[in-house]
UniProtKB/Swiss-Prot annotation:
Transmembrane segments: none annotated. PANTHER family: SERYL-TRNA SYNTHETASE. Catalyzes the attachment of serine to tRNA(Ser). Is also able to aminoacylate tRNA(Sec) with serine, to form the misacylated tRNA L-seryl-tRNA(Sec), which will be further converted into selenocysteinyl-tRNA(Sec). L-serine binds at residues 231-233, 285, 384. Pathway: Aminoacyl-tRNA biosynthesis; selenocysteinyl-tRNA(Sec) biosynthesis; L-seryl-tRNA(Sec) from L-serine and tRNA(Sec): step 1/1. GO terms for molecular function: ATP binding; serine-tRNA ligase activity. GO terms for cellular component: cytoplasm. It comes from Dictyoglomus thermophilum (strain ATCC 35947 / DSM 3960 / H-6-12). This is Serine--tRNA ligase.
Amino acid sequence: MIDIKVLRENPELMKENIVLRNLDPNKYDVDYILELDAKRRSLQKELDTLKAQRNKISQEIGKRKGEEREELIKKAKTLKEKIEELEKEYEKIEKELYLKLWQLPNFLSPKAPKGKDEKDNIEIKRWGNIKTFTFTPKDHLDLALLNDLVDFERGSKVTGSNFYYLKNEAVLLEFALFRLVIDTLLPEGFKLFITPDLARMEIIDGIGFQPRGPEAQIYRVEDTDLGLIATAEITLGGYHKDEILDELDLPLKYLGFSHCFRTEAGAYGRYNRGLYRVHQFSKAEIFIICRPEDSEEMHEYILSLEEKIFQKLEIPYRVVDICSGDLGAPAARKFDIEAWMPGRGDFGEVTSCSNCTDYQARRLNIRFRRVTGEVEYVHMLNGTAIAISRALIAILENYQQEDGSILIPKVLQPYIGISEIKPKK
């Protein structure tokens, strides 16, 4: 949520922010929000005055007798009724104000590139050499079916379209990838979590999980206030709701493992086939809570950890700085890692990392107390350590052989005990 004081002092900054994010200015009426804020403050001032008058009269009632006392009692009753009336109006305005504030996106980082959509994202780095095949490379789905690693047909029969079974060596790869992530991040001081797969909607809303477009919506559990989480960012972010942390304990570095559920309504096209865009997948999520002055450094740190994992896997990738018009509401700045995917002959997103500054902390009321005594909102950041479905695509396609077999990345071989997956069909 946005600090109303900042909005009050510089409304034009938010108006520009909305335009730069390629959002509809009519949906985010900053001037109306400020009108509500002014009404609320005016009502608060009036209420304070009336309550002071009521308190003064209440004190006088005990000192007076007869008609004078009765007159004061009437005045006190009139004031009470007026106060109750204004409190109802205040509550109504405050509720609308906070709803409007809740909908505003985070302020952009000055370093976030300006642009309209994903076409304006900026490539800032490449790593690794793209392999030249002496044959036409298959895509991951053909390879997975050839090697009996997935079953979409039975997944669809049991659960519905875009659900699947991971099988055989693909299961070993999932656990090996998680083990690689643990062995990479544990020495960095990360605490490990397996989080719930469900969260209250107030937590989901507090995190501000509002992906762009219709492609990633939350599954709601009917007749409850629960939703299936789309990322462990939600459950890790809610872990310290309504808490005041100690400055000396920051940064908090968490690594959370969870299933992720996304309806992915509207997702279609050849790039979305197979494992690229599915309703359920497993993921390890990096989550850091830090002081405001440290968040930019922590953002670069998360990116470096994500890079380290894909470098260990020896998969070529590029790093993309996401432009203003392609950012989700909570992120002030975001980096994506896109791995080379030979099956599509292009890069595809495998990780992201976002600096959400104090946006989520304000919504979830997570603060810290400095050693000097001041209490402030923390900054919160998140990043993908590994998303199994996307990582499998990159491994299968980059490590395929002409006969359809798959070499196991060297770094994963000790976890699995084999060096190659051989076709079974």
